[in-house]
Amino acid sequence: MKIVLDKDGLMSVLQQAAQDFDWSSLQSAADEYAGEEVMGCAEEVHKILNGLTRGHESTVLYATWGLVKSMLEAVAVQRGLMIVSENRYFDLIQDSVGRDSKWTRAFRAAWGLDPTASQYQSRGAAALTLYSLTAAMFDELIPEKHRNVVNTTMHLIKEAGYS
């Protein structure tokens, strides 16, 4: 990011401090946050499954939005991504997971970025896949106290024929 005006040089110092920040002291908290987000999105999975079963577009889309937003935040925080601009948010997260990964394909489909799968049913199914892949990616980070919720949610997704 280019600093436009910095008469006394303080902005340059602040910018450098942000770029040099060491995330390692926060990694355990970031891991915990990611595990909490996966568990918390079990509710969104239930809403998506229910909406798909009932053919209720608004339920699926709103729950998909919540799930995708939370999974993006979980990855960004857990990986300690420095978001240099909101315009790079999605790029940085996709790059950190891998542009050609199943996770990125599921994210893009759930977010409606796949022109061949823009119907709400496809987006809901992609969101369920995104949840499953995020839960698997963060499996070691999910605390034992949340394990039953996440495992039950994963079972429901598979039982419903998704993932």
Task: Give a label for each model feature.
Residues M1-Q19:
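A surface-exposed, charged beta-strand/loop segment in the N-terminal or early-internal portion
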Residues L14-A30:
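Membrane-interacting alpha-helical segments
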Residues L26-S163:
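Conserved nucleotidyltransferase catalytic core and NTase-mimicking acidic/glycine-rich helix/loop elements
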